[in-house]
């Protein structure tokens, strides 16, 4: 009789280890152990969690998202033994969740409460700050889309920056609308051999910094709380405590950190006053990281040269907000992650993670519910 690794064995250690670990129960007994004091994203599970069982048990997967028939087929074909449950009406969701082992999409509170036996939720969101408390407190493993949108967000971040440095927002675009050929009213700037400071080296920080270095010849400095190898294009990578030492050195300061208790209003008066008067601030992470009153003062009083925001607090930004009156500020409506291939990338990640789950392999984008990212 064919056997495979138990999915419940895959998740058996999470109760003791927390949802920060994606376990790989296919590892042989006596597998590698982590170094004392370390907290890796992937931990190889050892013998007690490796269970042999018949391979015929289906994986009941509830879909809590709008997907086309072709997209559902892609997910269904990701692994053998997948039973997709696609509720057509809201009233059917609770019953579907009650029998599901996996939920894909954006389950509402009622669905989460009914999902007593769910072991894993693959959420469509990149950030966690707006997810239901019931989901964050649920014992299930949670994965998200944290790196799916990063490449296109990086392009948007650099687009915001170029619109400032090359006078596109201040002059070129308004003058074009008026059919005017007029010299720039603001000093034009370049990025070559300038310094980028990245706050956060997750997907967004990685993609922006790589493009800035190799595409524009910028030097990259960065801070991030996670221990990680320094990418070859990054000159210096330090812990967050180095932030205020980094800020005065940079010509562009990028906010690419997640929204957590530690990062609320991280970018305030102290940071903006420490920046060069010729420096730019770019935020493509979350609006809550910025003290917007301090940013408005920084722009109006000339503490910094300009800023580009794809995110604000609240959203949409009210017409009477002080930011609308700021010079050399560009705001886009939180659309930096949008692109025609967005849905393709989402489905591709979901299918890959489902394949991994069915095979007892480590999942991608496992969230640490305690840290908030």
Where are these regions (language model features)?
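Glycine-rich, N-terminal phosphate-binding loop of Rossmann-like dinucleotide-binding domains
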Residues: 14, 107, 125, 257, ...
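N-terminal secretory signal peptides and thylakoid transit peptides that target proteins
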Residues: 1-18
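Phosphate-binding beta-alpha-beta segment of Rossmann-like dinucleotide-binding domains, i.e.
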Residues: 140-195, 199, 207-211, 215, ...
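Rossmann-like adenosine-cofactor binding region
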Residues: 225-322
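Hydrophobic/small residue at the entry helix of a nucleotide-binding pocket
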Residues: 204
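Signal peptide processing junction and immediate N-terminal pro/mature segment
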Residues: 25-35
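Rossmann-like dinucleotide-binding domain for NAD(H)/NADP(H)
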Residues: 278, 284-373
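An N-terminal-biased, well-structured beta-alpha scaffold segment characteristic
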Residues: 7, 34-141, 268
């Amino acid at each position: 009789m064919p056997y495979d690794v138990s999915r419940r064995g895959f998740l058996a250690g999470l109760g003791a280890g927390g949802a920060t670990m994606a376990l790989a129960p296919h590892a042989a007994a006596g597998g590698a152990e982590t170094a004392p004091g370390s907290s890796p994203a992937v931990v190889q599970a050892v013998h007690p969690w490796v269970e042999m069982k018949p391979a015929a048990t289906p994986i009941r997967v509830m879909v809590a998202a709008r997907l086309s028939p072709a997209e559902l087929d892609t997910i269904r074909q990701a692994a053998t033994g997948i039973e997709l449950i696609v509720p057509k009406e809201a009233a059917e969701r609770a019953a579907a969740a009650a029998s599901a082992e996996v939920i894909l999409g954006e389950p509402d509170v009622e669905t989460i409460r009914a999902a007593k036996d769910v072991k894993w939720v693959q959420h469509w969101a990149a950030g966690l700050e707006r997810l239901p408390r019931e989901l964050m407190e649920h014992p299930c493993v949670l994965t998200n889309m944290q790196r799916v949108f990063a490449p296109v967000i990086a392009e948007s971040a650099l687009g915001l920056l170029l619109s400032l440095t090359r006078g596109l927002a201040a002059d070129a675009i308004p003058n074009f609308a008026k059919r005017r050929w007029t010299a720039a009213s603001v000093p034009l700037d370049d990025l070559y051999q300038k310094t980028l400071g990245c706050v956060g080296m997750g997907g967004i920080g990685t993609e922006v910094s790589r493009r800035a270095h190799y595409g524009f010849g910028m030097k990259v400095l960065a801070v991030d709380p996670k221990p990680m190898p320094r990418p070859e294009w990054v000159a210096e990578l330090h812990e967050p405590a180095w932030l205020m030492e980094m800020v005065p050195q940079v010509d562009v300061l990028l906010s690419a950190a997640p929204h957590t208790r530690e990062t609320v209003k991280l970018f305030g008066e102290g940071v903006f006053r420490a920046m060069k008067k010729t420096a730019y601030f770019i935020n493509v992470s979350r609006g809550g990281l910025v003290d917007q009153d301090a940013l408005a003062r920084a722009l109006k009083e000339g503490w910094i040269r300009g800023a580009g925001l794809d995110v604000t607090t609240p959203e949409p930004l009210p017409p009477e907000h002080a930011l609308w009156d700021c010079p050399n500020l560009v705001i886009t409506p939180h659309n930096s992650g949008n692109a025609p291939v967005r849905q393709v990338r989402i489905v591709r990640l979901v299918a890959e993670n489902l394949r991994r789950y069915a095979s007892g392999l480590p999942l991608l984008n496992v969230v640490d519910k305690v840290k908030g990212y």
